[in-house]
């Protein structure tokens, strides 16, 4: 059974989300893992895509959108939403879920649930209590970049 977690962030540094997704972090302290020279280590396996943005310029593009709409300019505004879906290890072991398949699921979920938003979708493996878990992250700008048709629900 997958677990969904949501975090609303007032942090104006959109690049922090990018760094967390791409680089290795200690799962308990959340601090980046550094090599002998003090450089952050890239995750061994990750898949990264952007919706309505380039994944490697997500931060700059979100700032441009916010400036264009004159939104997210004050400290108290929620700047982004971060969704984390963690899969049960059985999904990998018994059903053959791969990182690529999890990324595809993440992209589908983001397209269906966050139309018009700039979004980062990233899948990676992490080890929690000595168990490897596959998870995907969706980070969206709280401001919708593109208009979408109203939905009937």
Regions found by a protein language model. Give the residues of each.
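N-terminal nicking endonuclease/strand-transfer module with a His-rich metal-binding environment
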Residues: 1-153
């Amino acid at each position: 059974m997958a677990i969904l977690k949501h975090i609303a962030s007032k942090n104006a540094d959109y690049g922090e989300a990018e760094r967390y997704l791409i680089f290795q972090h200690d799962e308990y302290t959340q601090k980046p893992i550094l090599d002998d020279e003090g450089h952050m280590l890239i995750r061994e396996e990750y898949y990264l895509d952007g919706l309505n943005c380039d994944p490697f310029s997500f931060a700059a593009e979100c700032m441009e959108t916010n400036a264009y709409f004159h939104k997210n300019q004050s400290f108290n505004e929620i700047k982004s939403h971060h969704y984390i879906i963690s899969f049960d290890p059985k999904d990998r072991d018994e059903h053959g879920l791969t990182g690529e398949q999890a990324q595809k699921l993440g992209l589908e979920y983001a397209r269906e649930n966050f139309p018009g938003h700039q979004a980062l979708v990233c899948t990676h493996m992490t080890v929690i209590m000595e168990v490897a878990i596959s998870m995907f992250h969706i980070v969206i700008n709280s401001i919708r970049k593109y208009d979408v048709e109203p939905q009937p629900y």
